From Swiss-Prot:
Its EC number(s): 6.1.1.11
Subcellular location, principal: cytoplasm
Record's protein name: Serine--tRNA ligase
Lineage: Bacteria, Pseudomonadati, Pseudomonadota, Alphaproteobacteria, Hyphomicrobiales
Molecular-function GO terms, alphabetical: ATP binding; serine-tRNA ligase activity
Catalytic activity: tRNA(Ser) + L-serine + ATP = L-seryl-tRNA(Ser) + AMP + diphosphate + H(+); tRNA(Sec) + L-serine + ATP = L-seryl-tRNA(Sec) + AMP + diphosphate + H(+)
Organism: Methylocella silvestris (strain DSM 15510 / CIP 108128 / LMG 27833 / NCIMB 13906 / BL2)
Keywords assigned: Aminoacyl-tRNA synthetase, ATP-binding, Cytoplasm, Ligase, Nucleotide-binding, Protein biosynthesis
Segments of skewed composition (Basic and acidic residues): 114-134
Gene name tied to this protein: serS
Subunit structure of this chain's protein: Homodimer. The tRNA molecule binds across the dimer.
GO cellular component, one term: cytoplasm
Binding annotation for ATP: R283, A284, E285, E370, I371, S372, S373
Domain notes: Consists of two distinct domains, a catalytic core and a N-terminal extension that is involved in tRNA binding.
Function of the molecule: Catalyzes the attachment of serine to tRNA(Ser). Is also able to aminoacylate tRNA(Sec) with serine, to form the misacylated tRNA L-seryl-tRNA(Sec), which will be further converted into selenocysteinyl-tRNA(Sec).
Amino acid sequence: MYDIKWIRDNPEVFDQGRKRRGLEPLAARLLELDDARRGAIAKLQVAQERRNAASKEIGQAMAAKDQAKADALMAEVSALKRDLPELEAAERAAAALLDKALSEIPNLPLEEVPFGRDENDNREHHTFGEKPRFSFDPAEHYELGETLGLMDFETAAKLSGARFVVNKGPLARLERALGAFMLDLHTGEHGYTEVNPPILVRDDAMFGTAQLPKFENDQFWARPGAHPLLIDMFGREEAEEMKKNRLWLIPTAEVPLTNLVRESILDEKQLPLRFTASTPCFRAEAGSAGRDTRGMIRQHQFTKVELVSITTPEQALAEHERMLSCAEEVLKRLKLPYRVVTLCTGDMGFASQKTYDIEVWLPGQDRYREISSVSVCGDFQARRMNARYRPEGAKNTRFVHTLNGSGVAVGRALVAVLENYQTEDGSIIVPDALAPYMGGITRIEKPALERPNSEKPVSRA
């Protein structure tokens, strides 16, 4: 969220940043709204000051035994008191219009971010690993999972509808192992503090990380004691009351982890703070109709290990590179080939100043697919959360800078392991990095199959 004072002082810079995102100029309109707010504040202050002055003059007139003047002043004060609620309402309305407009503005890209319209203009940063070579046509993950009898979309659809899955047996254990491996790596070697946060959060938390109001229709929400769809049956007042009591299912652990510092003032010596969590995540995928309708790539519910850092402005860019390397290390340990791309201005997320995507190679699809996004957000989220820190030796506070990244998406990591570690008979070799978590299971296969002497399909450096 941007400071209107900064926009007033830098309207051309602001509009130029929007242009790089492919957006229309907006500074003039925002300054009109700010002028209206400032005008409403001025009118309210004039009325309040006159009320206070007239109230004081009443006492003076009474002391001077000037009843006529006192009566006139009392009438004036009464009129001002009648007018003040309307002036206060006008000030609140003007402020609300400005706040709404500001809350819907995306973050501006850093100068180093490549210009572009969409994902086709993203730039490859670097690659890691060699793509596996198979002596057979590699299958997609859902073909492998269903053939093994361990990935069940039909039952999931009966339970919950489309875009859900039931994983069973050693496949469920493999998914659990992936999450545990990631958490152990990030906490044991990368210095992150593990957190087990709520997965139901209030509006303020979703606003703080900028999921609201822009992406309200992409989220799932619930209200104790009433189905959310019943909102259409109520009037405006009842609907607003329901909204006050609603809770949101988190689309990412970025929401609760980043909001751990909302409405707080930290000491500089505490920074950077680094948090990680493995949570279920929930997304409506409202804009994804017809995309990835089969398999686990795009689900309403999925597990993700999240990384969040809270830093000073001076630490933020170095922390961004560090977070990227932490996420990459997951795939390196799993020996999964991947590439890193720098997102262009037209493909960046709403709250991001700069984003790297890590895309893992999926042989079954014969393409790279996103498995992690790592973003630096500047003070964009901190302003929405009112999260500050006090520099050493300083009286005034500054907004912290926030960063977030997937470390990584557990479901997509499972997909990548299935496709990269498949064998010709359809069984799956368990990556060496996951062996400590699998209770002796080194190969996932149909219960009736016994292939103890099968070799891995490809050597992995």
